Amino acid sequence: MLRSIIGKSASRSLNFVAKRSYAEAAAASSGLKLQFALPHETLYSGSEVTQVNLPAKSGRIGVLANHVPTVEQLLPGVVEVMEGSNSKKFFISGGFATVQPDSQLCVTAIEAFPLESFSQENIKNLLAEAKKNVSSSDAREAAEAAIQVEVLENLQSVLK
């Protein structure tokens, strides 16, 4: 009996200490540290930013410093990185975002391109071609075309 009372008491104390140290660590950081990586390059490496808006599977989310830790699957769409009054927008084909308790955000994506690098005319042509390939008799080609259509339609809606 005494052992269970001591065990519960120690457990409560450890929980309080853990919560308290988390709160102090969160208060100590001033901004969100962003790691934005692709397989072939790193776009941001521990850079301090104001906010990052993400196209998550659960809906669009905005991440600020001291955000609740989470892991999100990212859909094709725009990642907006806000640095003070400046904003940079990247179109990603998908990926993952992990928010750490110490105001760190790690975004990993297969591809990411600045929005200004896209041409509406090019997207329109690629989308028409992909839509033709969706009805292909080759199952693999049809599946790849369906993915292209999803990504290109998202990109086209962002560029309008």
Swiss-Prot record:
Its main location: mitochondrion. One of its GO terms (molecular function) is proton-transporting ATP synthase activity, rotational mechanism. Pfam families: ATP-synt_DE_N (PF02823), ATPD_C_fung (PF21334). Residues 1-22 form a transit peptide. It comes from the Eukaryota. SUPFAM superfamilies: Epsilon subunit of F1F0-ATP synthase N-terminal domain. GO terms for biological process: proton motive force-driven ATP synthesis. Keywords: ATP synthesis, CF(1), Hydrogen ion transport, Ion transport, Membrane, Mitochondrion, Mitochondrion inner membrane, Transit peptide, Transport. InterPro entries: ATP_synth_F1_dsu/esu, ATP_synth_F1_dsu/esu_N, ATPD_C_fung, ATPsynth_dsu/esu_N. GO terms for cellular component: mitochondrial inner membrane; mitochondrion; proton-transporting ATP synthase complex. It is found in: Mitochondrion; Mitochondrion inner membrane. Signal peptide: none annotated. PANTHER family: ATP SYNTHASE DELTA/EPSILON CHAIN (PTHR13822), ATP SYNTHASE SUBUNIT DELTA, MITOCHONDRIAL (PTHR13822:SF7). Mitochondrial membrane ATP synthase (F(1)F(0) ATP synthase or Complex V) produces ATP from ADP in the presence of a proton gradient across the membrane which is generated by electron transport complexes of the respiratory chain. F-type ATPases consist of two structural domains, F(1) - containing the extramembraneous catalytic core, and F(0) - containing the membrane proton channel, linked together by a central stalk and a peripheral stalk. During catalysis, ATP turnover in the catalytic domain of F(1) is coupled via a rotary mechanism of the central stalk subunits to proton translocation. F-type ATPases have 2 components, CF(1) - the catalytic core - and CF(0) - the membrane proton channel. CF(1) has five subunits: alpha(3), beta(3), gamma(1), delta(1), epsilon(1). CF(0) has three main subunits: a, b and c. This is ATP synthase subunit delta, mitochondrial. The gene is ATP16.
